[in-house]
Amino acid sequence: MNKIYLRQIVREFYVDRLVSEQESADGTKTLTLTEKGKRRAISFNFGRMKLKVPDTWDGLWHIVIFDIPEKYKWARLSLRDKLLGLGFFQYQKSVYMYPHACRDEIDFIVEFFKVRRFVRYGVLKEITNEAELLLYFNLQRPTS
């Protein structure tokens, strides 16, 4: 694991408040999982993984975007297959949408394939051509 990649992961953990840092008198640093970090430190059965589907949709779209280099083609193809197998909608070649929260599962998958630096996860309130997604997932936009 290279140092730049490790720093990026640690920075993400700080932002999400998953780890805390303590510095000892001799200057060494210790990273410790916070309670939130411990709750996120979950394991999945990769082959049987399923995404939770709540009773009601909150109107938010969860998006996975990636740009995985050709030298990691196996990981790119495996990630695509996994997202489709989990029920994601392929919005574009490397853009996948899902109507429910799935950040923990996506974090696990990208770590499993070792492609975190090439994958982004986001949440959208609205997107153009939403009708196609609503039809695919058999949803109606929630009324306020």
Predicted segments with their positions:
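Short helix-coil junctions and helix-kink-helix linkers
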Residues: M1-K3
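Basic amphipathic alpha-helical segments that dock to polyanions
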Residues: Y5-V19
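Short amphipathic beta-strand starts and helix->beta connectors
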Residues: Y14-D16, N45-L51, L77-K82
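Short secondary-structure junctions
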Residues: L18-E21, Q90-Y91
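Accessory beta->alpha helical hairpin/"wing" motif in late/C-terminal subdomains of nucleic-acid enzymes
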Residues: Q22-F46
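Residue-level detector of family-conserved "landmark" positions at structurally sensitive sites
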Residues: E23-S24, K93, R120
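Exposed, interaction-prone assembly regions rather than primary DNA-binding/catalytic cores
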Residues: V53-R116
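Long, low-complexity, charge-rich intrinsically disordered regions
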Residues: P99-S144
